[in-house]
Amino acid sequence: AGQVFLDHKGRTILISWLPGWQYAGYKKKDIGCMSVPREIKLIDGKIYGYPVEEVQHLLKDSDSGLIRKSYGFKIKRSHRKSVVYKGEIKDLKIIRDGYIMEVFVNGGEEIYSVLL
């Protein structure tokens, strides 16, 4: 469930709810969290999402919780299967705290958000 709005700088911002009840071990029905706020842009007919400039200082190039593989990547502590990304990964940025990891591939061309 995403909320989209136009901010005072004219940016289109998306914040999404990431539900957690489908993950193993969660027993409460209200588990989840909000995503990192993303600026949404249309570039060459494709929608991109990238963290707003106010939180970009939190982005990293690597993370011990993410294992890169030849066919994509796997997020540790996630009960999901490996993510298969078809195409060359030119740029990979990661933001993580104790509850969520968000992976931005190729400047926000693809985004993967996982509760940990």
Predicted segments, located by residue:
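Beta-rich accessory regions
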Residues: 1-116
